[in-house]
Design a protein with these regions (language model features):
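N-terminal nucleophile
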Residues: 1-153
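Conserved small/polar residues in nucleotide/adenosyl-binding loops
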Residues: 154-159
Length: 159
């Protein structure tokens, strides 16, 4: 098999670090950092620096950080769209996240995931990949960590 046809096992791993936060006054924020796609075309800009695609925050809806194949996240303005569904259609954050990731993104054969939070403390994550590293720190100092698409998270008490 020619080398060009062999796919690296790491070809679909993303190196994105995302964060969403809620302060005690109900203000929310999001941040996204990425190393980008391996062997990308010169001049390619991914979704992370594009507000509304890979990162978005509005105290009227939600704060969101996303990771995945950037071209699809840009095309769908994934971050803004999830928050718009919460603000204008009244969907819960989890419903909005799942609709965009599992319906809209998958219909374009895009892959990735997101984390998001609302000013009232709803927290959601959604992904259509085998796993997505994620963690949650509660107000009481309880740390929850997850990798795969299961409901059980590792619970750690922070001191």
């Amino acid at each position: 098999m020619p080398v060009a046809e062999i796919e690296s096992p790491d070809a679909h791993k993303f190196g994105t670090v995302g964060v969403v936060a809620l302060d005690r006054e109900g203000n929310i924020a999001a941040g996204t950092s990425t190393g980008g796609t391996q062997a990308k075309r010169w001049g390619r800009v991914g979704d992370s620096p594009i507000i509304g695609a890979g990162t978005y925050a509005s105290n009227q809806s939600c704060a969101l950080s996303a990771t995945g194949t950037g071209e699809y996240f840009i095309r769908l303005t994934v971050a803004r769209e999830v928050c718009a569904l919460v603000q204008y259609k009244g969907l819960t954050l989890q419903q909005a996240a799942d609709q965009i990731i599992h319906k809209e993104l998958e219909s374009l054969h895009g892959d990735g995931g997101l984390i998001a939070i609302t000013p009232d403390g709803q927290l959601a994550w959604s992904f259509n990949t085998p796993g997505m590293f994620r963690a949650k720190l509660t107000e009481g100092g309880k740390l929850q960590i997850g990798i795969y698409n299961d409901l059980s998270l590792i619970h750690i008490r922070c001191v």
